[in-house]
Regions:
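Conserved, well-structured beta-alpha core segment at the onset of a catalytic domain
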Residues: 70, 85, 472-473
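Well-ordered alpha-helical segments embedded in enzymatic catalytic cores
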Residues: 74-78
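Protein C-terminal end segments and domain termini
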Residues: 275-399
Length: 473
């Protein structure tokens, strides 16, 4: 039986590669949103994580609460099993933009398949946030939409408050947010035709079929292009969350990416400004990723502001008159490859190193099946360099007790890098970003202390703990 697994996470910071999940809450329902069961997992703060003060002041999780949790490795096994239960559709609120990537990298560094919950055993993913945006555009009367200083907001906690959605806990508490999400989904589900129409945007085959049915009928020289409408929260309320786009084609090195260019930009690099075509912001869409593509039908087109339509006409005219430059822009972005990061940290190497090979999967399985007392022995037998280093980190993070000497030299070096203020010692991610360290946390604390007005007793207690913990890291 197909089921929804609504879930939410609270985390130590905002980086899905290097920060960790602290709490995971889920409620499984049938497809008519009737509850079947619920699960919650609390995870101890890892020894190599410097907590972000802003994150902790937002969710309010205390060190005492986290100390009662389980190690990340055990939590990863438990959560992986939940989202990989056959016929599970896992979904959250902005889950494809945030939570799911946290899950993916947690699974990866704990030697679990980071992608199987997307396609294996009839499993798949969804996200309620893009669906809420569609309702905001086309069925705005379905709920009350909150505003902040006169601007519409789609924040879940504000929607819950504005619509009196019944929950059992505090905002930014994982289970409370899951309850809010299901109550919101029930309201959206009341408009069943739209609900089911939106669900198909998260089916790879159905979404691709929809896009392929849209005619490529805009001609530039001897080539034909699809003009469509894309819907995304990121476009903002000023343009009604809608943007006219032109389909440039499929990425050559990354077959699952289709490339789109916004047509309502006031300046497109390479066309009348000082920038080059390499600087053009091309949207890289993956099937079922929550970027909604609609045909440029009049009833949709007329919901965009006049300025968007005017800029579209002007930009299409530029492309037609400077077609060789436009084709050059297309070819550059179709052929573009992400740069390799030579000193990327092993935790961050998922996209650069790719899927686990068949041999690596067998080594992962061997590690998982070994008892706690035999895992060190198994690690010594591993042949794959990346599996070996990730397995060693699992041991250091989850199975080391006693003095610092109980952990590996590699792990001690990792901790020293987090304490260092030197740029040369930064731990590198796949985007060229770096792992949050003690210096950044102390700077963030200093900023909060000067700007955070009238903290309540719990917040003062949290700030004091963060100050002590980070300084002693």
């Amino acid at each position: 039986m197909k089921t929804f697994l609504f879930y939410d996470v609270e985390t130590s910071g905002l980086n899905p590669v290097f920060d960790q999940i602290l709490t995971f809450a889920s409620i499984r329902t049938d497809l008519r949103l009737r509850e079947i069961n619920r699960q919650s997992v609390t995870i101890q703060l890892r020894g190599d994580i410097v907590p972000s003060p802003k994150a902790f002041l937002t969710h309010g999780l205390t060190n005492d609460e986290l100390a009662l949790g389980i190690h990340e490795y055990e939590a990863a096994l438990r959560i992986h099993k939940l989202v990989n239960t056959p016929e599970t559709i896992s979904l959250g609120y902005n889950s494809l933009g945030f939570d799911d990537e946290f899950l993916r990298f947690m699974f990866y560094r704990n030697l679990l398949d980071p992608y199987s919950h997307q396609y294996g055993n009839g499993c798949s993913r969804m996200d309620i946030l893009p669906i809420a945006v569609v309702y905001r555009v086309f069925h705005a009367d379905i709920i009350k939409w909150p505003e902040i200083e006169g601007k519409p907001s789609l924040k879940l906690d504000l929607i819950a408050e504005a619509n009196n959605l019944v929950t059992s806990g505090r905002a930014h508490e994982a289970m409370n947010d899951v309850e809010s999400l299901i109550e919101l989904s029930k309201k959206l589900f009341s408009q069943e035709e739209t609900w089911h129409y939106c669900l198909d945007f998260f089916s790879k085959t159905k979404e691709e079929a929809r896009i392929n049915r849209i005619k490529s009928d805009f001609q530039i020289q001897n080539r034909y292009f699809r003009i469509c409408i894309m819907i995304s929260l990121s476009f903002g309320s000023k343009v009604n969350y809608m943007a006219p786009v032109i389909h440039l084609g499929q990425s050559l090195p990354y077959k699952n990416q289709s490339l789109w260019l916004r047509l309502d930009s006031e300046a497109i690099p390479g066309f009348g400004d000082a920038l080059n075509i390499e600087d053009a912001h091309v949207i890289r869409k993956r099937p079922g990723d929550g970027l909604i593509i609609l045909p440029a039908l009049e009833r949709f087109w007329n919901r965009m502001p006049a300025s968007s339509k005017q800029l579209t006409d002007e930009n299409l005219e530029k492309f037609c008159s400077q077609c060789e430059k436009f084709f050059e822009l297309i070819q550059y972005h179709l052929e573009y490859r992400y740069p390799l990061i030579p000193d990327i940290d092993p935790d961050a190497s998922l996209y650069q190193d790719g899927f686990f090979s068949g041999k690596e999967k067998k080594e992962c399985e061997k590690f998982h099946l070994a008892g706690k007392d035999r895992k060190h022995e198994i690690v010594d037998q591993l042949q794959s360099p990346r599996i070996k280093i990730l397995a060693n980190r699992i041991l250091d993070r989850n199975f080391s007790k006693g003095p610092l000497q109980a952990t590996s030299k590699e792990y001690q070096c990792h901790l020293d890098q987090l304490r260092s203020v030197s740029e040369a010692n930064k731990i590198k991610g796949y985007k060229g970003d770096t792992k949050y360290g003690r210096h950044e946390a102390l700077e963030e604390l200093k900023e909060l202390e000067s700007t955070f007005l009238n903290p309540d007793p719990d917040q003062r207690k949290m700030m004091a703990w963060l100050n002590d913990y980070i300084k002693e890291f």
